[in-house]
Amino acid sequence: MLADLSIKEYLAKTASGDPVPGGGSSAALNAALAAALTEMVAQLTIGRRGFEAVDADMRAVAAKAAGLRPKLTADIDRDSDAYAQVLKAYRMPKATEAEKAERSRALQAAFKQAALVPLGVARDAVAIMGLGRAILSQGNPNAASDGAAGVLAARMAARTAVYNVRINLGSIKDETFTAELRREADRLEAEADRLEGEALKLLKP
């Protein structure tokens, strides 16, 4: 599994000629890293003198980030698995009309999954950005740069994931499905833009 590789192994595999891991898996990885950074800043605030008033809030942030981290770590492989299913469908036989129809059904199902996985990553990345805004507002200022790093990592993950959603929607014939996911992707992109601006304004010069 990709998530079980060392950092060096993952980077080497990404740099190779293999199609996976690609941008989608890397978006999930960046979102997982953003969750870890966000949780770290919350932990550096919890129980510290002078932050008693926000202790409960920071514990809630830490718990939410801790819950998202393993999900996003699993998405590293889910994204690559979804792409593998697209490739598998492309390789299906198409000599007869029946084979062509079966191949088309398999491709449509694979493309839908390949759009749904990054959409989930984008949702979680935007959620992490909201947590990041909270820690930049209330958290330990000595770790503000770490909090900002988390927000920016989540921002990159959200944008990359949204792009991947849109790319896969271009191959899907179900207009109702594509319209729904496109609206959701647009909403998440706008929300990420807003949260980035709000979060970074909280950084002290």
What are these language model-derived features?
Residues L2-L5, G120, A127, L131, ...:
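Polytopic transmembrane helical bundles with strong interfacial aromatic enrichment
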Residues L2-P21:
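Short, hydrophobic/aliphatic alpha-helical segments
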Residues S16-L37, N142-T160:
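Conserved phosphate/anionic-ligand binding catalytic regions in large, soluble enzymes, centered on
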Residues L29-L33, V61, L68-D75, A114-D124, ...:
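Amphipathic alpha-helix face/heptad-repeat signature
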Residues L37-L44:
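A conserved active-site cap/scaffold subdomain adjacent to cofactor or substrate pockets
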Residues R49-K88, L188, L195:
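A structural-propensity feature for long, helix-poor, extended segments
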Residues D79, Y83-L152, M156:
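Amphipathic alpha-helical interface segments
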Residues I128, I135, A143-L202:
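Preference for long, well-ordered alpha-helical segments
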